[in-house]
Structures are given as structure tokens and as C-alpha cells.
Amino acid sequence: MEGESKGLIVGISLGLVIGVVLAISALFCFRYHRKKSQIVNSGSRRSATIPIRENGADSCNIMSDSTIGPDSPVKSSKNGRSVWLEGFSKRSNVISASGILEYSYRDLQKATCNFTTLIGQGAFGPVYKAQMSTGEIVAVKVLATDSKQGEKEFQTEVMLLGRLHHRNLVNLIGYCAEKGQHMLIYVYMSKGSLASHLYSEKHEPLSWDLRVYIALDVARGLEYLHDGAVPPVIHRDIKSSNILLDQSMRARVADFGLSREEMVDKHAANIRGTFGYLDPEYISTRTFTKKSDVYGFGVLLFELIAGRNPQQGLMELVELAAMNAEEKVGWEEIVDSRLDGRYDLQEVNEVAAFAYKCISRAPRKRPNMRDIVQVLTRVIKVRHCRKRQKNSPSPSPRLPPPPPIVEESEGELTANGSLRSEIHRRDNSLDSSIAEDVIL
């Protein structure tokens, strides 16, 4: 009996020793294979192509296979994979279904001269001017790889702009999701942003007439998003730097990274947008609606009127002017001094009064974008009629028939010399196209 007990104890002890040895061996093998896998991943990352910001005549022809360093835009997560590539493969098929063309990293690297043609810096990354192999000039936005929302915003822009087409929206041509980089390729807007024309001394001040035209263009773009798109889309970040101007000074709404379809997640945990343009109702309720875009558009209207940035006390001036608006002198006090008195005061008062409705604290009191388009259209039509009447001679039976009227020169239509022909062209075609909203 005693011998059997000793044998049992020896057997159990031997089993435990063997179990411990096997466990240690398994752990050692696991750590060995994991370390080997990390070395392989590290080697593959080192072969990634990165931009060389090199100046010189031959910089467009230089390609780099350099090792990724701390200054590279390619960031890696703790597990060794590129942050941008985490989960992207699961959605790549969805993006392809949008119909937007996919470009290779190497083609964009060459088109931007190794990313040396910087033309702007947005909230989500740098923007480069690029000349494609076809000769087409485009804008390439490289989304910042250290942005936690970057990939989500990339997905949003591709999916939305893949189905949204309107002459007052910036057209997305293609995208690139390769080598840890996410890039968006847009139609190149040669005149830059509205903000640059309002605040940069490099540009002549925009005439009042052109400012109203720009406001109408933006309103039409937003009207399409709210009422023409299916399902409707809320932009959520209307501001002067997100309004781009083409060669003919037609305004287009850009940057849809924060946009959402109206049917999806109206409630947001975090406040997103730009200070100065944010709807107070959205700030308090965390819920964004079409009327949130209307509020942002109202701020943009006052920005066009006053030539002042909302982050530099614009709305405080607006509230002070509104107190005196009943005496018909309030709104004149905030008009951009760069206009040098070249504006119709009655028109300014009408636009400003309507802009004030757009920023009402109560969303239900704000107009919708369709109402805004109609009001701005009427303002321009009335202006057009006034100009025609001003150019027409007063009938007088006592005088001989007046000589033929000489058409007013384009130079007298606006103080903006470089923009005169566009204003003249728009005025002449107003009767046939002012209410037309073509969807490309």
C-alpha cells in the first residue's frame, strides 16, 4: 500500500514537470515567431516610397525608396502596421464602387514634383498643385496621417463626392490609398479660396456685385445638398476657406470631410466644425441639421458684407449693427471699408437683414436654402433691372430722338479690373439663366 502511494506521487510529479517544460517551450516558440514576424514587417515598411521635398530642375524625375524616418508622413501603430492601412482593406471595395478613379502613388509623386508644389495647407493636410501625364492640372490633398479622424474623413469625401455632382460643388476626380498615404484629387480651382480674396493683400478687393454672385453660387450648392441629393447631405463646415473659386470666379463648395447624410447619426458625441461658424443650437444639443448649415451660411454672408473673419469679432459687430438696423444706418456701419463706398446701400441692407434671419438663435425661424436662393436671385434681378433703367434715356417729346446708346464698358461695371468681364457676362445672361440650376 505504501509502495503504491509513492508510485502515485512520483507519477504526478513527473507529469507536472513535463507540463511545465512543454508550457515553457510553447511560450518560447510563440515569442520567437512573433519577433521574426515583426522583423519581416519592419523590412517591408522600409521599402515604402516617401515624398522628397527637394527643389531643383530635376526634382520631378527623382523617386525615393528611402527608409522611413521620424519626419516621414507615414506613421506606424504599435503593432507595426500603418495607421492608415488599419481596416482600409475592408472598405476598399466600397470606395471602388463609388466610380471614382484610383491613382497610383508614383503617378502623383511625379505629378507634384515629389510633393514640392505646395499651394495650401488645410485643416486635414497639405494641398499640392499637380500636372498629370495627360496635361490636366489638378489639386492633390494629402490627408494628415496623424489625424485620428483622417481615414474616416477620407472615406466620407470619396463616398459622398462619388455621387454628388453639381456646378457649385468641387468635383472629386480620384483618390489614392497606397503606401500608407491617403490622397484626394480634385479639379484645380485656379482662383483659390474666398478667404484669400477677402483677407489677402495680394488680391484686389472683391466688388460688391461679385460678392452677391458668390453668395448665390454657395447657396445653390447647399440647396442641392439639402434638397437635390438623395439622401440629403449636411455639409457641417461652411466657411470662406472652404469656398473655392474657378477661373471665371464661380464659387464652389469644398471639403466634405465632416459632411453627413441627413438620415445618418444626426447626434454627435464631439463638436466638430470651425469656431465662429458653429450653430449655437448644435453646440448645446450636439445635434446638427440643415438649419446648422443655414447658420453657417448666414455667418458667411456677413463675412462677405464686412470683410471680417468671424474669429475676429465679426458677430459682435453684427449684433451691435442689428440694434441700429431699424434706423437704416446699422448695416452700413459694418460694410467692408475696402469697397470704398462702391455698393448699393439698399441692396446691402436687404442682404444683411436676410443674413440676420439665417443666424437666428431659434432654428425654426431660419429660412431654408431654397428660400435663400430665391431671395438672392431676386436681389440680383432687381439690380439688373436698375442698371437697365439707368442706361435707358428718359423719354422727352420736346427733344429730338436721342442718339444710339453706347453700351456701358465693362470697366464701369465693377472696380475689380480682372473680374469685369465676368460680371458683364453674368449680367447679360441673367434673364435666361438666373433661375437655372444645372446639375452636371
Curated annotation (Swiss-Prot):
Interacts with calmodulin (CaM) in a calcium- (Ca(2+)-) dependent manner. Binds to MEKK1. The modification Phosphoserine is found at residue 241. GO terms for molecular function: ATP binding; calmodulin binding; protein serine kinase activity; protein serine/threonine kinase activity. Residues 386-427 are annotated as: Disordered. This is Calcium/calmodulin-regulated receptor-like kinase 1. The modification Phosphotyrosine is found at residues 186, 282. Belongs to the protein kinase superfamily. Ser/Thr protein kinase family. The active site is at residue 237. Its main location: membrane.
